[in-house]
C-alpha cells in the first residue's frame, strides 16, 4: 500500500528572494559618480535606436537561479539581445540566460586590489566578454577581453576600439576620453545640456535670419 504524505509533511519549495539592493552605495564620491553616469548615459545615447540593447548602472546581476549570494552590481553593464526597460535586478535565467557582454567598473580611493581581483574572476566565470576598469584619480585604464573561458588583459587601451560597443578609448595626461562610433566624445550631463542649449540658440538665430529674408521657417 502506498502511504501518502499529509499536507503538513509535504516538502514545500522555498521561495528565494533576490534583493534589488546589496546595501552598498552606487558611488563613494562625486568623481566616481560622474564617470558612472557619463558612461552609462552616453552608451544609452549610442544605442538609443536599438531596442535590444539593455544598459544599466549599479544593477544587481544574479547569474545563477537558486542562489542569491552569487551576485554583482557592475557600475555599468551592457546586455546585447535583451530589450530595454525596467528591471529591479538582472536575473539571468529570466533574460534568455544572456549574461551582460560588457562591464565597466570605476575605481574609488577605497577600492582594494583584492576586491577588484574578485570582480574580475566573477566576470570571467559568468560570461562577460569585455571588462573595463578605470581609475580616474591616477588616469589608468585596464581592460580584459574573453579568450575561451578566461578574460585576458588587453595590452594597450590607448586607441582601443571595443569590439562590442564600437567606442574608442583615448588616454590623455589629464583624463580618459571615450569616443562614440561617429567620433564625437562622451559628454557629461552638464556638457550635454550645454550642447543642447547652444543648438537651440543657433536654431533661434537661424529662424530669425530666415524671417528677415521673408522666409517662414515653419514651411521648411
What are the language-model segments listed below?
Residues 2-10, 15-24, 45, 61-74, ...:
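C-terminal interaction segment
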Amino acid at each position: 500500500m502506498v502511504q501518502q504524505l499529509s499536507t503538513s509533511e509535504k516538502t514545500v519549495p522555498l521561495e528565494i528572494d533576490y534583493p534589488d539592493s546589496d546595501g552598498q552605495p552606487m558611488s563613494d564620491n562625486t568623481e566616481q559618480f560622474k564617470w558612472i553616469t557619463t558612461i552609462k548615459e552616453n552608451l544609452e545615447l549610442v544605442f538609443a535606436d536599438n531596442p535590444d540593447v539593455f544598459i544599466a548602472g549599479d544593477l544587481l546581476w544574479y547569474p545563477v537561479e537558486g542562489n542569491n549570494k552569487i551576485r554583482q552590481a557592475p557600475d555599468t553593464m551592457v546586455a546585447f539581445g535583451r530589450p530595454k526597460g525596467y528591471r529591479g535586478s538582472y536575473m539571468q535565467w529570466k533574460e534568455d540566460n544572456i549574461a551582460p557582454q560588457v562591464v565597466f567598473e570605476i575605481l574609488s580611493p577605497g577600492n582594494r586590489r583584492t576586491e577588484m581581483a574578485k570582480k574580475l574572476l566573477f566576470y570571467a566565470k559568468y560570461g562577460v566578454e569585455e571588462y573595463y576598469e578605470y581609475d580616474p584619480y591616477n588616469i589608468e585604464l585596464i581592460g580584459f577581453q574573453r579568450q575561451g573561458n578566461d578574460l585576458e588583459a588587453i595590452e594597450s587601451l590607448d586607441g582601443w576600439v571595443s569590439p562590442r560597443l564600437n567606442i574608442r578609448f583615448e588616454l590623455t595626461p589629464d583624463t580618459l576620453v571615450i569616443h562614440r562610433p561617429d567620433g564625437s566624445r562622451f559628454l557629461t550631463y552638464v556638457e550635454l545640456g550645454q550642447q543642447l542649449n547652444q543648438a537651440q540658440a543657433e536654431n533661434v538665430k537661424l529662424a530669425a535670419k530666415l524671417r528677415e529674408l521673408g522666409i517662414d521657417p515653419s514651411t521648411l
